[in-house]
Amino acid sequence: MHPAHLLVLLAVCVSLLGASDIPPLPLNLVQFGKMIECAIRNRRPALDFMNYGCYCGKGGSGTPVDDLDRCCQVHDECYAEAEKHGCYPSLTTYTWECRQVGPYCNSKTQCEVFVCACDFAAAKCFAQEDYNPAHSNINTGERCK
């Protein structure tokens, strides 16, 4: 093999090793995103909800900016309740399917059922509320006290 080819191969291997340090999203969050898209019938990507209002996304505080943000607050509270029962919501995967009428949970274990129910309720709530682009990526430090 030509030395230049070896250098290119080495560079690719090193960059792949570096990329392996990037943590993936917990599988449950991927499932939750798919469940949201099922419930809202793909009207918008689930990622649009990641930084919405005071509660949609990581953490949450203050008063929800609207009813959609309130869906996220209730979801956070549901996850907190699951943790009190010994579950790890962000790591718990569950079995569900997207049916004609929307998401349907068919998990078996207590934690899977609990977490799926939290995600199901939030996804259905998202489907019933309006998305206001003005509430996306707000300054939570100022707005969510």
UniProtKB/Swiss-Prot annotation:
Main location: secreted
InterPro entries hit by this protein: PLipase_A2, PLipase_A2_Asp_AS, PLipase_A2_dom, PLipase_A2_dom_sf, PLipase_A2_His_AS
Single biological process term from Gene Ontology: arachidonate secretion
Stated role: Heterotrimer: Snake venom phospholipase A2 (PLA2) heterotrimer that acts as a potent presynaptic neurotoxin by blocking synaptic transmission and synaptic vesicle recycling. May act by binding in a calcium-dependent fashion to neurotonal pentraxin-1 (NPTX1) and neurotonal pentraxin-2 (NPTX2), but not to neuronal pentraxin receptor (NPTXR). Also binds to taipoxin-associated calcium binding protein 49 (RCN2), a protein localized in the lumen of endoplasmic reticulum.
Organism expressing this protein natively: Oxyuranus scutellatus scutellatus (Australian taipan)
Expression sites (tissue/organ): Expressed by the venom gland.
Disulfide bonds: 38-98, 54-144, 56-72, 71-125, 78-118, 87-111, 105-116
MF terms (GO), sorted A to Z: calcium ion binding; calcium-dependent phospholipase A2 activity; phospholipid binding
Pfam families: Phospholip_A2_1
Complex formation: Heterotrimer of alpha, beta, and gamma chains; non-covalently linked.
Record's protein name: Neutral phospholipase A2 homolog taipoxin beta chain 1
Record's subcellular location: Secreted
